[in-house]
Structure formats: C-alpha cells, structure tokens
Regions:
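Long, positively charged amphipathic alpha-helical accessory segments at protein N-termini or as interdomain linkers
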Residues: 1-31, 40, 44, 158-165, ...
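N-terminal lobe of the biotin/lipoate ligase/transferase fold
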Residues: 2-181, 201-203, 255, 329, ...
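Solvent-exposed beta-strand sheet faces enriched in polar/charged residues
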Residues: 50-52, 190, 208
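Short loop/edge segments at beta-strand edges and connector loops
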Residues: 91, 189-191
C-alpha cells in the first residue's frame, strides 16, 4: 500500500476529526515530509483536506477516490462475510476484462480468493477509466474518467459453469439491487445485458468464459460491468445522447463509486449462490420487453435475417421467448432485439467493461 493510500485510509477513519501530521507519520511509518507530499497529492485528486491550527489534517467528507485500499475498507464493512477478496484497482487501463483475461491465462485461478459460504473463488479488477472498454459483439464501451464504474469480477465456481447465460442474467439483477440500495432508484433490464433508468441505458454487462479443452466445460468466467454514474449531457456525444444516460446526471450525489463498486461486487457474489429459479423470477419482473413488439437481430450485421416478433416470456434458461409474425415460437439464446422506437443497437456504450 502506498503512503498516499495509508494517509487516505487514516483520514477516512476519522472524518471531521483532525489527525496530526506526527500521528500520521507514526502510523504510516514515514517522515512528516512524506505525509505532506501525500496530503498535497490527495488534494490534487480532489480530496477536501483542511489544515488545522495545531498542524493536523481534517478530511471533510469521504472522497470519491477509487483505489485498492478504499475498496477493501468499504467492502469489508458492507460484506464482512466476504472479507479478504482479492482486488486490483487502476487509474486507467485498456479494459478490465482484457486484463482479467490476461492474468487468468497467465496465473490460473491461484490468485483468486476462496470466499467462505460461497460456491467458488473470486477476484475483482476495477478501473477509474478505460481506453478500450469492450462490449458484446466487438462493440465499444465509452469509459471516461471519474464519471463511471468499470469493473470485472473473475469467478471460478465449484464444478464449472453449467449455464453461462445465467451469469449475465444474475449479474444484471445484482446491479439493479446495488443501485436500489445506494441511490434508491428502480432500474429495468433489457434482455440480455443492459440496465435502463428513465428509458436510458446506464449499464452494460459483458460475460466471457474460459473453457477447459480436455473436458469441454467452462471452468471460469469474467463478468465485466460498466456503469454510467454521474455523466451530464456534455459528457455524451450527440449520438449517445439518444440512448445513454447515467444514474445521477451530475456530480453532486454524495454516494461514491467505491460504495457502488463494493455493493455491485458483493451483490454479484451473493446472487451467484442463489437458486436459478429465484434469479430468473426477479430478472423477469425487471424486464420491460415482455409483451412488446420487437425486431430480432439473430445475426448481427446481416440485415437480411432481421424479423419482427412479440416477446412472450423469459424462460428458465434465461432465453427470450418470442413469437414471429408467422406464428412460430422461438427461444433466443443469442443475438439482439430492439423495440421499433429505440436505438438500442448503437455501436457505442453497448455493454461491458
């Protein structure tokens, strides 16, 4: 842990209570000069740290800074039963999913944390921003700094993954739960991986699996989650303004990205230990597609394959059940659907991390 992280942790544990420079130097085992440099660096990052007359430092409010220490501290408070989860945070990265895939390929599952009372091992990769955020079907996920949350949860379940589709479905429900807890806002789901608030997309999920070539089973998965938190209209291109939104639409909400990262991660771990039927039931209750007329895109990029249908249901395997205009009922496990009035197939901000 860096000196800056140690100082931030110490001040965060004493919100609105001054901590002397000497006390910080002793607890961090560094010089007063190193403390002064760390304080200045934190101020440059936006932390409201005041100097007091007796030479102490006062943190006025919890800063919206994402790092390994702030996440570990928050996660330990929110989910003490999952404490010790392996986490890595980056200021910027090409893609959290790409990085997670790289370390999973190089190191295997040895670095994952075996979570007590769960059915597998986990780790989480978090970034302040992404330069090459990825979505489904090779699309881009726009990931600007300090306005969103971009994370990838690595999951290696006992016995492998029998139904990969349920991972995306479960994660979508988990994100909705986290947003409700932190912001008290109800969100809805567009099959299969998009979260909507006020008719605008605020989150996408990209799930990727690792197959054991000897057994043919999927041993591990990476669940990439990208959430727009406090963007305003100036943060979106004219194209994205038609489809993309954010949770807060400004930067004044007191909730921090660390709090959301903690809740999303914990809710995902929790829900992956639930029965599949209960997950599907909640997923269906949050879907806004059932009963709607849609266009089905079974092969992305091939407009000749598009057909119109009515959404009837979401079945127990997380497939979208539709009825085409000729009366045929189909269970969709891949592809995309769009409402006639929407622009949900925009090439950007489409999903994932």
């Amino acid at each position: 842990m860096t000196t800056k992280e140690l100082v931030l942790n110490a001040l965060s544990n004493s919100i609105n209570t001054p901590v002397s420079g000497q006390a910080l130097a002793v607890s961090c085992k560094v010089s007063r000069t190193a403390i002064w440099k760390a304080i200045n660096s934190l101020r440059e990052e936006g932390c409201q740290i005041e100097g007091t007359t007796n030479g102490g430092y006062l943190l006025k409010e919890t800063p919206d800074i994402l790092n390994t220490q702030t996440f570990a501290s928050q996660f330990g408070k929110d989910f003490p039963e999952f404490s010790g989860l392996h986490c890595q945070c980056f200021k910027t990265i090409d893609s959290t999913n790409t990085y997670a895939k790289k370390i999973l390929t190089q190191d295997g599952t040895g670095f994952l944390t075996r979570i007590e009372k769960s059915k597998g091992a986990f780790a989480v990769i978090i970034a302040e921003s992404q330069t090459a955020g990825r979505g489904r079907l090779g699309r881009t996920f726009v990931s600007p700094q300090k306005t969103g949350l971009y994370l990838s949860i690595i999951y290696s379940p006992d016995g492998g993954i029998s139904n990969p589709a349920i991972l995306t479905t479960a994660s979508a429900v988990a994100v909705c739960r986290a947003i409700k807890k932190l912001y008290n806002k109800e969100t809805s789901i567009k099959w299969i991986n998009d979260i909507f608030l006020n008719n605008k997309k605020i989150c996408g999920i990209l799930t990727e699996g690792f197959t054991n070539f000897e057994t043919g089973a999927i041993d591990s998965a990476i669940i990439g989650i990208g959430i727009n938190i406090n963007q305003n209209t100036k943060d979106f291109s004219e194209e994205l303004l038609k489809t993309a939104g954010s949770i807060c639409n400004d930067k004044t909400d007191s909730a921090t990205r660390t709090q959301l990262a903690s809740l999303v991660t914990g809710e995902v771990i929790n829900i992956l230990n639930q029965e599949q039927d209960s997950i599907i039931s909640e997923y269906k209750s949050r879907s806004f597609l059932i009963g709607k007329e849609v266009e089905v895109h079974p092969v992305i990029g091939d407009t000749s394959k598009i057909y119109k249908a009515k959404v009837l249901d979401i079945n127990s395997e997380a497939n979208l059940v539709v009825q085409s205009q000729d009366g045929e009922i189909k269970n969709l496990s891949s592809g995309e659907v769009s409402l006639k009035s929407d622009l949900f197939t925009s090439d950007k901000n489409s999903s994932g991390s």
